[in-house]
Amino acid sequence: MSQQLQQIIDTAWENRAELSPKAAPADVREAVAHAIEQLDKGLLRVAEKKDGDWVVNQWLKKAVLLSFRLEDNAPMPAGGYSQFYDKVPSKFASYTAEDFAAGGFRVVPPAIARRGSFIAKNVVLMPSYTNIGAYVDEGTMVDTWATVGSCAQIGKNVHLSGGVGIGGVLEPLQANPVIIEDNCFIGARSEVVEGVIVEENSVISMGVYLGQSTKIYDRETGEVTYGRIPAGSVVVAGNLPSKDGTHSLYCAVIVKKVDARTRAKVGLNELLRGD
């Protein structure tokens, strides 16, 4: 079924200029709607780990973008205090008490998750925003004013602190989603964007900004890398001097590495304060 869906969506993508809310073949509408439904239920994912590597299902990103072409904007009620005007309804627009109980997560007002995002059991959504295509796995806390961007992949038992920004990735289409693996802590007001991967059991301090052009300096080895935080890293904001010594530029500094056992036993503040 997924292979057939992919073929229909890939073909529709090549002919997307011809599509509109009033002009789209029935099979394309059905395929896109089914793909969004599967994303919403967590049965399909924009990215998944296979044999230790993350694989991106680009066709599902295409399905999300096609859904924007196939839907008109429409008024959406917002509990009596306002209205929205958009193409994508709230994930919870038609939820009953039984649906919430079956989902097993908490949604604190006025948290918003768009339809096509997946929220797993024991997730807590404080007043926050989760975009279409995102996957938020079990036991994760999305704290107040945090944003989970389109198609971002958030692992199990992750803490996204207040004001954290996890970047979206629908445009440009070839870009990979941001991935935060299991048991990570992302400190307040930090930003992870442009397909950066934060591997499992890592701790990102408050106010760390990570994009593909951000230098990641390993204090232990002196190595500079880009785009990936290794498993078990403790990361703080820092600066590296220019070659001529006239100025310094922002970087992220890996100050130490810890294993899962140490991570579980030692408090976050102690990890971040240690020399």
UniProtKB/Swiss-Prot annotation:
Keyword Transferase included in the entry's annotation: yes
GO cellular component: cytoplasm
Annotated protein name in UniProt: 2,3,4,5-tetrahydropyridine-2,6-dicarboxylate N-succinyltransferase
Compartment list: Cytoplasm
One Pfam family cited in the UniProt record for this chain: THDPS_N_2
Primary location: cytoplasm
InterPro entries, alphabetized: DapD_Trfase_Hexpep_rpt_fam (IPR005664), Hexapep (IPR001451), Hexapep_transf_CS (IPR018357), THP_succinylTrfase_dom1 (IPR023180), THP_succinylTrfase_N_sf (IPR037133), Trimer_LpxA-like_sf (IPR011004)
Binding partners and assembly: Homotrimer.
Native source species: Paraburkholderia xenovorans (strain LB400)
Binding site for substrate: R106, D143
Enzyme Commission number, as recorded: 2.3.1.117
The keyword Transferase belongs to this UniProt entry's keyword annotation: yes
Catalytic function, reaction form: (S)-2,3,4,5-tetrahydrodipicolinate + succinyl-CoA + H2O = (S)-2-succinylamino-6-oxoheptanedioate + CoA
CDD domains hit by this protein: LbH_THP_succinylT
Family: Belongs to the transferase hexapeptide repeat family.
Keywords: Acyltransferase, Amino-acid biosynthesis, Cytoplasm, Diaminopimelate biosynthesis, Lysine biosynthesis, Repeat, Transferase
UniProt gene name: dapD
GO molecular function, one term: nucleotidyltransferase activity
Xref: NCBIfam families: dapD, PRK11830.1
Pathway participation: Amino-acid biosynthesis; L-lysine biosynthesis via DAP pathway; LL-2,6-diaminopimelate from (S)-tetrahydrodipicolinate (succinylase route): step 1/3
SUPFAM superfamilies: Trimeric LpxA-like enzymes
A GO BP annotation: lysine biosynthetic process via diaminopimelate
